Amino acid sequence: MNSYFTNPSLSCHLASGQEVLPNVALNSSAYDPVRHFSTYGEAVAQNRIYSSPFYSPQDNVVFSSGRGPYEYGSNAFYQDKDMLSSCRQNAMGHNTQTSIAQDFSSDQSRASVQEQKTSIQIYPWMQRMNSHSGVGYGTDRRRGRQIYSRYQTLELEKEFHFNRYLTRRRRIEIANASCLTERQIKIWFQNRRMKWKKESNLTSTLSGGTGAASDSLAEGKEKEEETEEEQQKE
């Protein structure tokens, strides 16, 4: 019954040279509860002594130091972990080096672009040429033409039909109603009066006689409006 202990093919040794199964006496107290079975008897109890070592020959191979074809020591797993950690560290170092190189190249390109911008010499003809497109290099840029909406032009035309000259109070009211500034309304009325004068001159030349009188009255009203604005500013 004790052939398992004497079989040399099943012997497995630890790294320190000790056997896996210690030499424990059969009359030890550790096997007392295993011996006494009421159903199977003493022979069956002796066979049941091999509780844990019977299933552990393959598990104990892991702790061997010879490293046969199917044996792997505990150091092999730690070596693999060390190799993985070293590979990760090398990859991280490579990534940091590439990011630093990219940042350095981008900084150099920005510095070169700024140097090119500062080295460009601006001439007056460049300012005049690009002033109409809104890309002026100097301070003498022309202001863009004001575009009025349909609602704004309709309100201004109605006001011009009744009053060709506006007071400051009326100009403020129209500016609040049409979402425009006083200066924009003033310029629009000036342009509209010039257009109206040209139209009236054409009609007077065709009909004859009354054109000069209407022009003199319009000029007098414009002068009165300018003097009134100057007085309000003072």
From Swiss-Prot:
DNA-binding region location: 141-200
Biased composition (Basic and acidic residues): 218-234
Gene Ontology annotations for the cellular component aspect, listed alphabetically: nucleus
Pfam families listed in its UniProt record: Homeodomain
Alphabetic keyword roster: Developmental protein, DNA-binding, Homeobox, Nucleus, Transcription, Transcription regulation
One of the protein's GO biological processes: anterior/posterior pattern specification
Segments of this protein annotated with the region Disordered: 200-234
Major location (coarse): nucleus
Domain of life: Eukaryota
Protein's cellular compartments: Nucleus
Residue ranges of the motif Antp-type hexapeptide: 122-127
Gene3D superfamilies xrefs: Homeodomain-like
Region forming the signal peptide: none
Similarity section: Belongs to the Antp homeobox family.
Protein's job: Sequence-specific transcription factor which is part of a developmental regulatory system that provides cells with specific positional identities on the anterior-posterior axis.
Protein name in the entry: Homeobox protein Hox-C6
Native species: Notophthalmus viridescens (Eastern newt)
